[in-house]
Every structure is written in structure tokens, then in C-alpha cells.
């Protein structure tokens, strides 16, 4: 973006700018300077930004981050290349906008699922019921990923540049914390449950959530991805069972059945 004459500088760090056929106010000084107002005709700032982001998403998906051309993005969005820098401080920032907050949204989905499960009685949260509930949640996760197919495709291609590692940390931490809390509650209710090594839990959890992107990477459809997560989730559940070795209290109905089967 060309230097702005002092005569056009407003108060509170605002600058009167004109670029790409638009006249707007720009707030200076941030890591990613923002368009905060529009004047003089033309389409609105939000619409222009959305057009740039949509064009960038298509360009990144088609050519990858390194080969993507800002000039092509600008041309498709109907703005100048310089206008892009009025909205985004770098190509990396533009990629981040193209992905949006879908990783954070996935963390929130899992957090809500954990809270929902924890709100149930301990009887409703037996290990077998937990497996059935997890299968339901995993299908919701796959649907969420496919509802944001393009964004997660970009994440799979560029995990570091899109903050996926941070989101993966969040997901793994949620899984480890909820698993250990669940084990503690079962023990308090009279179950015999091992407390797995936290590092083992973290590694397994990260691998599980990372694998959720594989259907996207391999180009399979939603229904095939749902079949994948159902089978993969069962494998994960049986692994958790092997680590925790849960034994229900002998006084419970399930425990009585288990005891009769063992006699």
C-alpha cells in the first residue's frame, strides 16, 4: 500500500484511504490493520473482505500455499493486489482467514460433548455407555469436518500455518483431562479402574484427532468417512478399555451379570 499523505490522516489512528475502487477508513498500528469504515460508494468492506477470502480459499486449494498468487486472488476478488494488504498483513494471515476458526469450533464441539456426558448420572456413564456416546460424538465430529470441507482441506495441507497444532493441543488436553476425570469418578463409585500414563493418553489422543483428517486427505465422501470413524472409534475405545481395565462393582446389575458369566 502506498504511503498515506499526512493531510489524509484522521484522529485516533484513522487514515482516509482509497484503493481498489474503494474509499475507506483504516485503523493503523495493529499487527493486522483493519478496515473499519467505508465511504464514497462501492461495495462494503465486509463484502470486499469476504470476496478476497473466498478467492484466496479457492486459490490455496487449487495451487497450495507457496504457489498461490496474490495477483490471481486480487483479480478474482475484483480488487488490486495492494488492496489485499489493507485487510491482511501477509500471505500467511490471508491463509489463516481462509481457514477461519474451524479448529477452534471443533474444540468447542468436543468441550460441549464432554460437559454433556459429565452431566449424566454415574449409572448412565458406565464404560459401555461411554463407548456408545463416543460413537455418537465422533459422527458429529466427522459431520462438522465435512460441513467445513475446504477449510479442513487447507488445514491438512498446511497444519502449522493454520494453527492446527494449537487446536490439536486443545483437543488432546480435553481428551486427557476428561479421561482421567472419568476414571476418578468411576473409582469413587466403586469401580476398579487403572489410571493410565498421562503421556500415553496424550500421544494416543493426538494421533486420534490427527487421523480425523485422513478421509479429507484421501478424498473420500462423507458417508465413507462416517463408516471410517465408526470403525476407527471402536478401535480407540477398545484401546482405552485395555489401558483402564475397568471392572464394575460386583453389587451393580452389570457386575452381577459379569460375576455370573465368570462362574
PLM regions: where:
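C-terminal/domain-terminus segments
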Residues: 57, 155-172, 227-240
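C-terminal peripheral helix-coil segments that are non-catalytic and often amphipathic
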Residues: 2-36, 147, 177-184, 199-263
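Hydrophobic alpha-helical connector segments
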Residues: 97, 111-144
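Helix-turn-helix
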Residues: 51, 55, 59-93, 97-98
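Short, basic, alpha-helical segments at the C-terminal edge of helix-turn-helix-like DNA-binding modules
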Residues: 70, 100-107, 114
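Regular secondary-structure segments
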Residues: 57, 107, 111-114, 118, ...
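Amphipathic alpha-helical packing segments from all-alpha helical-bundle domains
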Residues: 136, 140-147, 156, 160-188, ...
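Short linear capping/connector segments at secondary-structure termini
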Residues: 120-127, 155-162, 189-193
Amino acid at each position: 500500500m502506498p504511503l498515506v499523505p499526512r493531510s489524509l490522516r484522521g484522529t485516533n489512528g484513522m487514515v482516509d484511504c482509497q484503493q481498489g475502487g474503494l474509499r475507506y477508513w483504516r485503523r493503523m498500528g495493529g499487527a493486522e490493520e483493519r478496515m473499519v469504515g467505508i465511504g464514497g460508494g462501492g461495495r462494503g468492506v465486509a463484502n470486499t473482505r469476504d470476496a478476497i477470502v473466498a478467492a484466496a480459499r479457492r486459490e490455496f486449494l487449487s495451487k497450495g500455499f507457496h504457489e498461490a498468487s496474490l495477483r490471481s486472488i486480487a483479480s478474482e476478488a475484483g480488487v488490486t493486489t495492494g488492496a489485499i494488504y489493507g485487510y491482511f498483513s501477509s500471505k500467511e494471515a490471508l491463509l489463516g482467514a481462509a481457514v477461519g476458526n474451524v479448529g477452534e469450533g471443533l474444540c468447542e464441539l468436543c468441550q460441549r460433548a464432554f460437559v454433556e456426558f459429565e452431566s449424566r448420572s454415574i449409572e448412565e456413564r458406565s464404560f459401555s455407555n461411554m463407548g456408545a456416546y463416543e460413537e455418537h460424538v465422533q459422527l458429529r465430529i466427522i459431520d462438522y469436518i465435512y460441513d467445513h470441507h475446504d477449510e479442513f482441506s487447507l488445514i491438512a495441507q498446511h497444519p502449522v500455518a493454520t494453527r492446527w497444532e494449537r487446536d490439536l493441543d486443545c483437543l488432546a488436553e480435553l481428551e486427557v483431562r476428561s479421561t482421567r476425570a472419568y476414571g476418578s469418578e468411576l473409582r469413587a463409585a466403586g469401580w476398579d479402574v487403572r489410571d493410565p500414563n498421562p503421556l500415553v493418553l496424550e500421544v494416543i489422543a493426538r494421533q486420534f484427532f490427527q487421523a480425523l483428517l485422513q478421509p479429507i486427505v484421501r478424498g473420500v465422501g462423507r458417508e465413507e468417512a462416517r463408516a471410517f470413524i465408526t470403525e476407527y472409534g471402536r478401535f480407540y475405545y477398545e484401546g482405552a478399555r485395555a489401558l483402564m481395565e475397568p471392572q464394575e462393582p460386583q453389587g451393580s446389575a452389570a457386575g452381577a451379570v459379569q460375576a455370573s458369566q465368570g462362574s
